Structures are given as C-alpha cells and as structure tokens.
C-alpha cells in the first residue's frame, strides 16, 4: 500500500497530514502554509483557482468564488436555512431539489460535491509534491453529526477528485486520536468541536490504545460562519439606518462585509476592541460611502448570545446519553477555530467545571487524527482500536406514519441489526421499505434516506408473511438495507445513496470534468515555470555579455542581445513552443561564445605557456 494521507475537509479551511518517521505531521501546501482555504473560484478566462489564490480575488469576483460549500453537501434545498444561503454567489436547486451552485463564468451549475472535489484534489496534489511520491488514497473526516446522505456525498467528492477514500471518520473522534495517541492511563474526554459551519460534541474513553466513543451530539447548522453572518447583518442594518442604502443587495459589498466580519471576529479573540474599516463600500448621488465602525468584545458577545447558547444543548445531551456527570470528564479538548472565541471557552468551562486543554492546535488536530487513522490502515501505526458510533437513529416507516427504530443513536459501528415486519392488508404481495434517520417519533420529523420495494410476497392474511429487514452500517457510517421474505427467500437490498443522487455515470463525468481543469491548471503552472526560466536565462546572459572583453567579436555579442530581445518578446505571448526553441538557441550561442572567450583569454595570457613551477 502506498502513502495514505489524512484530510480534514473543513467548511472554512482544510488541512492534510501524513505519518512521517512514525509520527503524524501536517503537510505544507504549495503556498508554504499549513492550512488551505476551502475556497474554489473560476475566473472570466475560465481558469480554476483553489485555496489562498481563490480567496485573494474573492472581492473582485464574488459571484464565481465559492466558500462554505460544506454546509450544502449531501443536503436537499429544503434542509438549508435561508440565512445559510445569504451569500455573494447564487445557490439554487434542480428538479430533484438537490443543491446547485451557479457559476456565471462557466455558465453552468455545480453540485457541492464537485466544488469540494477541487479542494480535495489540491490537497492531494500538494501532498504528492511534499512527500515526493504519488498519493491516491486518503482518510477524510466529517462532522460527527453528519447524516448518511452527507457522508455518502463526501465519498462522492473523493471519487470526483480521483481519490480512493479508504475511511470516513468523525472529526471529534479524529481529534481524540491526536490527543490520546501516547496516553497510557484511561481518561474520559469531551471533544468540543466548533468549526466554520458545523458543531459536534463527543465523549470518549481513551487509553492504552483503545478509543471508544460513548456518545455524540451536535448541530450541522452552527459554526463560525454564523457568527460572521451576525456581524454582517449588524453592519448592513447599521449602514441602512444611517444612509438608507441596503448593502445586502450588492454582492461585492457583501463579500467585503463577510471578510471584514471574519477579521473582526478573529481580532476580538485577543483584544477587547477593534475597528472595521471599509472605505468606498458603495456610492450614491451624494458621493462615495465608507464604513468605519468600532466593535467591542462585549457588543460582539451580546450580538452572538443566541448562537453561544445553542452550543449548550449538545454538551448536555452528550453527557446525558453517555450517562455521565460533568465530574466524570477528565479533559476537555477544543477543536475548530471558533473555539478561540473567549465566550465559547467560558461556556465550555461553565458547563464542565474544567478549563479546556490547550495542548492541541484546534486548526490541525483533526487532520493529525485522520493521518493516524491513515497510518493504522497503511500498517504504519499498530495497537490502536477505534470504536466509533452512529450519530442518529435509523429505522423504517410503519403503519400510521410512525418511525420504527432499528438502530439507536450512539450504537458502536460497524453494526448489523434486524427486525421482523409483516403486511398491513390481506393478500398484499409487495411492501415499500421507507428508510429514515432521526430521533422523532413520526416520519415527518425525520430525514428520508430513500426507499425500495420488495415484490414476490405470497398472498396471505395480513400479519402472516414474515419480512426480515436488516440494517447494516459499515466502518464509514454508510448504511445498507436488506429486506427478505422468510418463506420464499425473496430479497431486495439497497445501499443508501447520498441526497445528491449522483449515480456512477454522473460521478465519472464529474471526474473527467475535474481532471480537465486539473490538467489545464498543471499546463498553466508549467508555462509559468517556462516564462520564469526564460527571464532567468536572459538575466544570466546579459550579465555574461557585460563581462565580455574585446576578444569576443562584436557580431557575436550582438547576436546574443538579439536572442535575448526575441525571448523577452516571446514571453509576452503564449507561444511556448517558440519560446522553448529560442531559449535553446540562446543556450547554444552562450556555450559557443563562452568557449571562444575562454580560448582567446588563454591565447592572450603571457603566463599561459609557462610550466608549473
């Protein structure tokens, strides 16, 4: 098995890590940074930009710059809040209510999986360059509270990126691996994971190589983005009140406001007060308008109080599900950049009675844990057992619109469970199996994962046929369901597909499309390298020419200068074949003239014919 990497595919930033010399370490990306913004953009020239380079141009290209896409992955249109869709780029839905992201630059729509795949592809390419060997396999983390559709969609993103996803693991579980790798004594830890778009709490028993998840709870619609949005709305409302102009309808202003809000939020984690400067945010007939707004930490915390309070419920629920009191928790591990907010840290301390452990980097700990899991699969790390759980209950619809649970939440995975059902009416020869995920008693309150039909049931009185329904969850948390009629042995099975409904053909088409952009990106980078080499060659040649003495004929010098001029003109065009030919011509001419200069210098040296003393 080749090198397997661990990837934290985050809402705001992503990180890739690998085992090196027996220890997990974060991989530096092509820009020399340890984290990569989860941002993808397409320029008006149809060029693909990913990461930091995409983030830098967001203000001038807001409608074609896509961020926080993880909030949409594996979700239907009706499952996304109105607030989450308040973005500089446009989010719509297709005829099946699947989320689509509009890209005016290419005049086409993307699925969230396709956008996420471009981030994954960059991480894999950076890992390949850094490690000096091709990387094609990865362990990818997801929020613990991701449902089956969201997990399947993440797997699809990996396929589109050309990555073999060996394992999907929960982010808090990955963080616990990183924290507890060298722990010998048993500890009960609470992982509080507040990222850019999702929130998870997991409680685990850690020690002596065993990592057992006791419970998990969370909110997949709560994260740092929501704190940013509160500030954006505050700025929009304040500006509207003062100037009677609604900045919410201006996509460029909205992008600038979003960036300024994030910057202010980050600053207020270390200082008590900051000022938001946004010159020339818009203009009307009276002239340009500016924003210069002071923001204190107290005001920020008051604005975000409702969000901070939402963090309370999953902590209490997780403790209750694990049948533990806060006194039973030995350590609190903070994960995600949003846990740097002082009010969040204060909440955690008040709920648990303990100061959070600060020994791990909240931005990198999940990727480090994913790398450890990758190392386990690749045989680089041994003697570790990971016992994860399913975050939500799974079941089927039964008579009267009731959800009958087959696998309860917080059940250790992998797991297989069966229940017996029967027909509802006389002489019924088929049954519809409607698969659900959630905690509500009625079907309407839960997420529908899909359905299938079992035909060939012998005609009989209601309640007579015996239909065995088996739910099977694998180590990735992906669900398969099988229904079997006991008398005839007839059966039907289905692996639940993600809400994106991407079939194999669609995934293959998206992979080809993604590879096309990756190939174009590679060619573009190679061409830039050629131009840089050409400039360096011209510089060296000019330096050499200036050192020539009268022993080199003037026509030879002039030829070099002409070749340099031709190359500089070719650099301004995109004719790279011509440029390469001219570079070779200059190299040959320089070799000839340097050899000639050396011969002439030797011939004119009065000491050259003397023997060594």
UniProtKB/Swiss-Prot annotation:
GO MF terms held by the record: ATP binding; ATP-dependent protein folding chaperone; unfolded protein binding
The keyword Oxidoreductase is annotated on this UniProt entry: no
PANTHER family: HEAT SHOCK PROTEIN 70KDA
Family: Belongs to the heat shock protein 70 family.
Keyword Nucleotide-binding: yes
Function: Acts as a chaperone.
Keywords of this entry: ATP-binding, Chaperone, Chloroplast, Nucleotide-binding, Plastid
PROSITE patterns: HSP70_1, HSP70_2
Gene Ontology cellular component list: chloroplast
Localisation: Plastid, Chloroplast
Protein name: Chaperone protein dnaK
Pfam families: HSP70
SUPFAM superfamilies listed in its UniProt record: Actin-like ATPase domain, Heat shock protein 70kD (HSP70), peptide-binding domain
Gene source species: Phaeodactylum tricornutum (strain CCAP 1055/1)
